[in-house]
């Protein structure tokens, strides 16, 4: 199969890269084993977005694509971002939030001294979001007036998981029954908290399981029925917002006609000649392209491999009497550095802090191979970090695979910005008749 650009990985960075490359006019193939780390994603874009033209353009592109996909995100009016309530009950700051969560900005809610406040709603069949615990932590950490109530979802759920409950919320008949129950349980005729002079909270937080597809209609119906703003909490794994994102963005990209997904496929071979990747392949098919985006995730996503022994290289320091002091633990240097398995890229990072590891790249995100790895995955592995050399001319790294630093670990903002830029550069390179890399397209 032949494409202009092949994206390896379909997590957040991979999807943004595919959308960006397609917007640049490229015919794009996406190869992935799964939806990447989206199943672990809270749904929020956290971390400092930073400044600069690239960041502004990337975030605008993300917001516009989300609107077209039917999964709108909101950017906070305040420069500091949204202050949202995490499932732990503590505050979490986000630069971007899905429409389903953005109404939960804590700065718009009254404090404990100001009457009605936030109601945390829980479901008795869903143990991942215990309303009483979340409310107690929120009162302690935010200073807001917070109460809680729980309601049952009925026998249809049993003790189901988040995905099972989300599918139930897509059932229109069942949801109408849930609306009636929510009115009775969450909005009582008498004051909903002792000492308050109103029966209605300022806002209600729900677990983020209000449907895989009908969530926007459900939130609107709940807000109208309950008479106050309603929002979802940031997600815990398995993430329903992450599943929504993958489904809605994939559908939009496929419907636009420039992106083809090869899901459930694992790249196991690469063909590199003269510093350029010519093809990648799974067990059955070879995919050729003029440019490639590598968005396979870091150590957690399988984009970097680490020897199991590296996770257990922990010892106790000897005390003054020569015995091991169990209160003075230290981490030995990792016996093996993380290895990038597809191109045998030269990697760097800070000891056993795996979030800091990633391939060495130039300023455009093009990675360097290790010495002796010119033949790609079919060449013999080198034994140590290779000398610096020219980067692969038509491969761009994006997302968590880039790694982070002690001060800033990888986050969703990094995935969005790096994915947008990698896709843009790959499309620009693929459009050149001679296939040679040009400068950053402006």
Question: PLM ranges: what are they?
Answer:
Residues 1-3, 283-291, 391:
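Core beta-strand elements of the Rossmann-like FAD/NAD(P) dinucleotide-binding domain
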Residues 3-30:
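N-terminal Rossmann-like FAD-binding beta1-loop-alpha1 element of flavoenzymes
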Residues 6-8, 287-299:
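Short hydrophobic core segments
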Residues 19-20, 302-308, 392-394, 398-433:
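A conserved FAD-binding loop/helix module that cradles the flavin
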Residues 30-51, 158-166:
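Conserved N-terminal glycine-rich FAD pyrophosphate-binding loop of Rossmann-like flavoproteins
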Residues 135-140, 175-200, 204, 211-268:
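Helical element adjacent to the flavin cofactor pocket in flavoenzyme catalytic cores
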Residues 268-286, 292:
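Conserved beta-strand-loop-beta-strand element in the redox core of flavoprotein oxidoreductases
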Residues 370-376, 382-407:
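Short FAD-binding loop at a beta-strand-to-alpha-helix junction that anchors the flavin cofactor
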């Amino acid at each position: 199969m032949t494409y202009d650009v092949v994206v390896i990985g379909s997590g957040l960075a991979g999807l943004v890269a595919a959308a960006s490359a397609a917007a640049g006019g490229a015919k794009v193939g996406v190869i992935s084993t799964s939806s990447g780390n989206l199943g672990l994603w809270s749904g929020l874009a956290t971390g400092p977005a930073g400044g600069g033209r690239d960041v502004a353009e990337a975030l605008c592109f993300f917001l516009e694509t989300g609107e077209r996909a039917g999964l709108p995100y909101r950017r906070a009016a305040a420069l500091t971002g949204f202050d949202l309530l995490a499932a732990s009950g503590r505050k979490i700051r986000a630069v971007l939030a899905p429409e389903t969560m953005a109404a939960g900005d804590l700065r718009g809610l009254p404090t404990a001294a100001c009457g009605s406040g936030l109601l945390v709603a829980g479901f008795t069949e869903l143990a991942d979001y215990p309303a009483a615990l979340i409310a107690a932590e929120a009162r302690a950490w935010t200073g807001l007036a917070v109460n809680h109530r729980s309601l049952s979802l009925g026998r249809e759920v049993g003790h189901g998981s988040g995905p099972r409950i989300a599918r139930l919320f897509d059932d229109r008949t069942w949801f109408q029954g849930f609306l009636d129950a929510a009115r009775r349980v969450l909005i009582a005729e008498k004051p909903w908290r002792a000492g308050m002079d109103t029966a209605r909270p300022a806002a209600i937080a729900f677990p983020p399981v209000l449907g895989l597809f009908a969530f926007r209609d459900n939130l609107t119906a709940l807000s109208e029925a309950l008479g106050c703003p309603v929002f979802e909490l940031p997600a815990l794994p398995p993430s329903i917002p992450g599943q929504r994102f993958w489904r809605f963005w994939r559908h939009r990209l496929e419907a636009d006609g420039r992106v083809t997904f090869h899901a459930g496929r694992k790249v196991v071979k690469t063909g590199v000649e003269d510093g350029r990747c010519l093809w990648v392949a799974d067990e059955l098919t070879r995919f050729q392209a003029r440019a490639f985006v590598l968005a396979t995730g870091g150590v957690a996503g399988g984009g970097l491999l680490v020897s199991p022994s590296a996770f257990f290289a922990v010892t106790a320091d000897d005390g003054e009497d020569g015995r091991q002091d169990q209160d003075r633990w230290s981490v030995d240097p990792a016996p093996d550095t993380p290895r990038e398995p597809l191109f045998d890229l030269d990697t760097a990072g800070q000891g056993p802090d795996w979030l800091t590891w990633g391939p060495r790249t130039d300023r455009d995100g093009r990675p360097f191979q290790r010495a002796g790895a010119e033949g790609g995955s079919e060449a013999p592995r080198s034994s140590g970090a290779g000398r610096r050399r020219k980067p692969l001319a038509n491969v761009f790294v994006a997302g968590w695979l880039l790694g982070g630093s002690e001060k800033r670990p990888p986050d969703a903002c990094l995935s969005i910005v790096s994915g947008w830029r990698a896709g843009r550069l790959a499309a620009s390179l693929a459009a050149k008749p001679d296939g040679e890399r040009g400068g950053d397209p402006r």
